[in-house]
Amino acid sequence: AVLHSLAHTLIKGSFLLQISVVGKMYGNYKVTRNGGYFRADPLGALVMVCCLLALIAMPPSVLFRTEYLIFTGLLSGGLWWIFVPVALLLVAVIYWLCAKILPLLSRPADLEQIDREGRNPWLSAVLLLLVVVTFAAGVWQAPELGALIDKIVY
């Protein structure tokens, strides 16, 4: 649970900071009305894609690993009545994220109306590094952290 919370903090923090850059560039925070972000800010769009993949718990994200542990723990404990609504809520969140963020990245837009001075490549690079670290934690786990998780779980 601690690893899951830490990963969510890093990923959602990166996601929301990148959304603030989107707001500065487009002049509003209505993500569904905006588009063309890949052409306006390629590095920022890469951060958004990586955050989206991490938030929907796509492997090798650390959230995939922790949610898998949570769900297998629920099922092995016979708590299917908790598992079903949580899994349905997770599917709804994944749908909502994809429905809101993918149009921002792929919809055509008039790039003349976008304030490209609002881009912050240094911030985007740091955010991308944070998200890549969470992907690395999903692939490679420090032995000490694995021992701590095993001690807590078992």
Each PLM stretch: what is its role?
Residues 83-84, 125, 143:
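Enriched - but not universal
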Residues 87, 126-137:
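Hydrophobic core of alpha-helical transmembrane segments in multi-pass integral membrane proteins
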Residues 117-128:
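C-terminal membrane-solvent junction of multi-pass transporters and transport-like membrane proteins
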